[in-house]
């Protein structure tokens, strides 16, 4: 049981983990019999819905950071404001969300679309429960997420995001750019061209991506990778990772997400094959 995001005193996290340990769930059944399957549960705890917003100091630094990006401030100035904001820390959930947006923008400024995608994806996950963004801002951030996924080589994730945002962008002046990008990804599929991306195991010991192709492999591993897990529409599989080995996915598994478990800061190249 792991607390993947929290704001407030650590005692609240400890209480939430104790509550999670006492929780029970009913396993999947087939023909009236329990079946072997993987399971993952995300539980959100909160004391009340009344606490919204952020501290004045956080808001001031947040606005200063994005204003510096807008006016083209020097890297030194941006680094200084970014450091001040991260050093301030988070007290409320809303600060956690918007700090993730800041980290995404900062990573983009540094040319790290993998980290930008990861932080923005985390921020957007709060929308369903807490409605932290206006509809217009949420759509804007979803479109940013799509481009980070494309630039980081997460084409399966990009296609999933596209299925959500396509109705939003049909009237955009930028629609042709979206359409050409999707057409190129589909052409890659049709022609069966392999493609690669850089992966990093972050502080929660995992990395994940939606697979577009029917096979994958790991190369250039710097660090320690322990195991992979495949979560598919029609099956689940876990296995130890061997670098430079091609793993083929059964045709009947369909629509798979690859999860990689390893030591934090381990980097590698993942290649998807057809």
Protein language model regions, located:
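A short, well-structured alpha-helical segment
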Residues: 1-29, 244, 253-254
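A short coil-to-beta-strand element that immediately follows conserved catalytic motifs
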Residues: 2, 35-38, 107
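Acidic/histidine-rich, surface-exposed loop or edge segments in extracytoplasmic proteins
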Residues: 2, 59-63
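Extracytoplasmic/periplasmic, Sec-exported soluble proteins
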Residues: 4-12, 50-57, 70-73, 111, ...
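Short, positively biased Gly/Pro-containing turn/loop motifs at secondary-structure boundaries
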Residues: 17-53
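Low-complexity, Pro/Ser/Thr- and charge-rich linker/hinge segments at domain boundaries
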Residues: 49-60, 190-194
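Alpha-helical protein-protein interaction scaffolds
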Residues: 62-193
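Eukaryotic alpha-helical solenoid repeat scaffolds
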Residues: 167-274
